[in-house]
Amino acid sequence: MSFTALIDITRPDADLPAEGAIPVLNLPERQDRDLWIPRLIHAKKPFAIASLDAISQEEVTRLAETSRRRKLPVAILNAYRLIPVFARLREVVVSGCLGKMNAVKVHVPAAISAVLCADIALWLLPAASAENLSAASDNRIAVAVTGSNGRADAILDMDARKASLAVRIGETHREIAVPQMISAVTAERDILSNTLPAAHRWPLLMHADDAASAIVMAEAFTTNGKK
């Protein structure tokens, strides 16, 4: 059973969504977002941005500050979190089978968003920094997490559109089946429509302050000449 409906806002003159409906803003023009975002904030209405590419860094920073201050959930869709191989990797980490997490490494292909890769690193290990990112030599996003009991490696090959996940604990090595390269957007929208925000954010989705932190981390990575 859905808790609410989703309303796609793709034009500036749309009506304010009905009570309970969650708006997903897909407005490429800054002036249109400048019209809609204050309206939704004033109405204390949780909402989502369709993509991080559709919003400026300045807007992300301001949204993060506003959502914290007003305790208003603001999600940003089209993240990498719910791509199946990374979602399963998160399940492995949260299960505790790897023990205490102490390291994460994300290899970032040149053509891939460093911000979204940084968000993966922070999602898996909140203490991660730019040092946890490295430039990939091919078009694969490779994520390695190490805990006190073992290690897990997730690889998403963007060219072959294939994914793999392997877990090693002691002498035991296991390949975990994951769906191949599919969009995470459907899963993100399902979360928006089928769950209620907890502690002022939707579980699993990238929040505005997550995006702000990932931007800072990615900038440090790029400034250091690693991408």
Question: Language model features by range: what are they?
Answer:
Residues 22-79:
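Beta-strand-loop-alpha-helix segment that lines the small-molecule cofactor/substrate pocket
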Residues 2-3, 21-31, 38-39, 72, ...:
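C-terminal helix-rich "cap/oligomerization" subdomain common to oxidoreductases
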Residues 33, 37, 60, 86, ...:
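A general structural signal for well-ordered alpha-helical segments in protein cores
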Residues 105-150, 156-160, 209-213:
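Rossmann-like dinucleotide-binding domain that binds NAD(P)(H)
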Residues 11-21:
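Short acidic low-complexity segments
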Residues 5, 54-112:
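A contiguous active-site-proximal alpha/beta segment in oxidoreductase catalytic domains
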Residues 134-193, 200-205:
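NAD(P)-dinucleotide binding in Rossmann-like oxidoreductases
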Residues 7-11, 25-30, 49-53, 78-79, ...:
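Structural motif
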